[in-house]
Amino acid sequence: MAERMVPSPRHERLRQLLVEAEYRANEVRQAYQRASSAMRSGQVWTGPTAATWTTELEARHQRLGRLAQNVVDAVEEELRRSPPLVTEAEANAMRREMAGRT
């Protein structure tokens, strides 16, 4: 007789992690927009050093946004690989592993 299927604790945890990662990635994408806009306005700090600083700030901001998206993409990929339903024995093993009791 087939063992009863139950929701996967790992799948559920990955879903929660994805929500958090997407939220944080959105925060990161907006993190330096105010500073960048202020610098681009020409009313905060001007000159060659200011222009260089602004360019570096924007480059780092873009890189940070890409890295945050990489985290979201990795969690999504792992979620796709994780079945939403597993046997009770598998679910129990996952719970033990997630609790550090392997």
Question: Predicted regions: what is each one?
Answer:
Residues M1-T102:
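N-terminal secretion-targeting helices of virulence/extracellular proteins
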